[in-house]
Amino acid sequence: MKLFINEFIKDYKKKTTWLYFLLSFGIILLNSYFAKRQFEDGIDAVKILSGITVVSAALALVFSLIMLANNLSQEYSKGTIKFLYTKPKSRSAILTAKIVLAFINYIIFLVVGTVFDFLTKYYVFFDRKVGLNHLNDTIEEGYFGRTVAKQLIITNLADLAVFIFFVAMVVLVCVVFKTQILSLVLVMLSLLGTGLIQSLTIFAVSKFSWAKYHMFDVPLFSSYYASEAGRNTVKEFFKFDNANALIIMLVAYSVVFFTISYIVNARRDITID
């Protein structure tokens, strides 16, 4: 616990952490502005509220992974791990603390961002017309007949599951190669290069059914639960008839990545640069 608290304090003493919060607020405000323009003819409070966490979740994922990659790369270059030549258990404890901190950072960014998004939409952009009284309203169509509250719970749990996979991937790359750049490139490729990767996957799946099981298709898990349109796309183009294969992929890749990371982290000969 002391180790985790120490890592937490170190993170929130950094100016870059607070810069990430400011960037998040700026992006959220910009998104709210465009949302207001979109609903000039009439406010759909249910639709707006049901997607209130979308931007915050995406930003939380990106910034918490950047912080994790930076923390791990610094640990191997000038941190405590560098000097723990004969204490693999201590190395594993430090690695675990940083992984746990990544999840805490994700939740903090998600909650703070969502609260900020809601308050600015409620008081600034939509003149108190997007309120919590709509949480029990049913979304009209395309969302499995869910209420707003149920939609928020399901989508955020699915996003959190996918976040576990991304954390495992970042940790693996940082531990094995001791660099944050490659890990961030992989994450950004997964997030920003989705269109290209999915186009190639759709083509490959039409030729070889096993091609759909590559790691960059794991994020489809959140798409499967996000909406009816998303589920239909996953089924029709990527040939996942249900979520079982996606769950197995998510768990399998995450377990393998974490296992390799801990083994390498415990056995690596760490040299002083």
List each model region and its residues.
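Residue-level recognition of transmembrane alpha-helices
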Residues: 21-24, 98-99, 187-188, 250
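Aromatic- and glycine-rich beta-strand/loop motifs that create alpha-glucan
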Residues: 1-21
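Membrane-helix interface segments
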Residues: 15-17, 90-91, 179-183
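Transmembrane helix-loop junction
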Residues: 74, 87, 122, 175, ...
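Secretory targeting signals
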Residues: 27-71, 96-175, 220-247
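Alpha-helical transmembrane segments of multi-pass membrane transporters/translocases
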Residues: 20, 228-273
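Transmembrane helix segments
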Residues: 29-37, 177-218
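Helix-loop-helix units of permease transmembrane domains in multi-pass membrane transporters
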Residues: 4, 71-108, 270
